[in-house]
Amino acid sequence: MRKTAVILCLFLAAVILCGAAAADDRVFTDSLGREVMLPAEVTNVAPSGSLAQIVLYSFGEENFVTISSALKEGERHFLADRLDNLPVTGSMFGSKATMNPEEIISMDKKVGIDVVIDVGEPKKNMAEQMDDIQEKTSVPFVFITQSTLDSIADSYLTLGEMLGQEERGEELAEYMGGIVSMYEENMEKIGDDKVSAIYVTKIDGNAVNLLGHNSYHAEILDGIADNIAPEAVAGSGLGDQYTMEDIFQMNPDYIIVSGSGLFDHDYYNEIMGSDMWAALPAVQEGRVIESPADAPWAWMGNPPASHRLVSILWLGNIFYPDVFDYDLKEKVKEFYSMFYNYELSDEEYAEMLKYSTGNAEQTASSPAPVLGILAGLGAVFLRLRR
């Protein structure tokens, strides 16, 4: 009888302990509609992909137990040092997908992963793929949508809820949502009086890559200017390849050119030092502006995460200063403090935006514009004859 009582007590204790453990877990519904069991407190996060890494950083570097990719120079400059020493687990989706179940199982044993988080644009079969790797690893996988400007604020609220940082999520959502609302209101005032622009992502001799309109990566450019590059064909952040003859035909009001690295200005210098580019009025009149790159990520996107909102503050103030009327330096510093927990110095700001505010002068090595004009007209003439 006594033995039976002991067994019964042990059984009841086990039931109580299991119930307590279950009570510590919670069901979270991700953006794909998947119900995922998460710990009551999520502290150890592994990002899947660069976009997730960017977005999650705003909630604090202490959450990371892995990173999606090795840090570049700009990331090392602006982000917390400890990230550079974390293991790399890669990305589950995209052309550079390297994440695999075996590695996640291994990392989970070493560092204890509460959840793997992917952020971005939802695509076909994502739910099935995440269910599959979750089953193989016994590690929760969650997807959060952040694919358009309108989805940014909600993504921060959702992440704040999942991470148990509701207050921080609300703060970020309010700040990011405020930028988007200001942008939409100001562009209504601009109406059809947009400047025309192209965004040069790469230059290789006569080959020039532009971000085409209606691209996932070109949402801000399409909205804040008349992006006169043809409709995007390639889905990558490098866009599609064109020739200088194509650029002459477009003849944009502004040329936005990607920086080639943190505090590097190779592409800008190539444009300003070229006799061919000198044929364009935008070059002659100082309307070539460089988009900061690796600061810690490219302001124009690639990946197109919420950090690209700083380009709204920047381009709006350059293109339409009477409407986007504010101190740009103060706005950029505020953004870096809010988004990266980084206090940007005046010197860093000046170097990052050295060629990013318009009215730039040609470099001393630039050829006489007339040579470029003749070369450009000749190229256009040949193009028209074809």
Regions found by a protein language model. Give the residues of each.
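A contiguous binding-surface segment within folded domains or other stable secondary-structure elements
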Residues: 239-290
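Structural recognition of the beta-strand scaffold that forms the well-ordered cores
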Residues: 44-48, 65-68, 114-119, 140-145, ...
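Short helix-initiation/N-cap motifs at beta->coil->alpha
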Residues: 31-33, 86-103, 147, 234-244
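Short, solvent-exposed loop/turn elements at domain surfaces
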Residues: 36-38, 53-58, 73-77, 205-211, ...
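A short, structured surface patch at a secondary-structure boundary
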Residues: 46-124, 227-230
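Alpha-helical, coiled-coil/dimerization segments enriched in small aliphatic residues
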Residues: 93, 209-238
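Secretory targeting signatures
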Residues: 1-24, 360-386
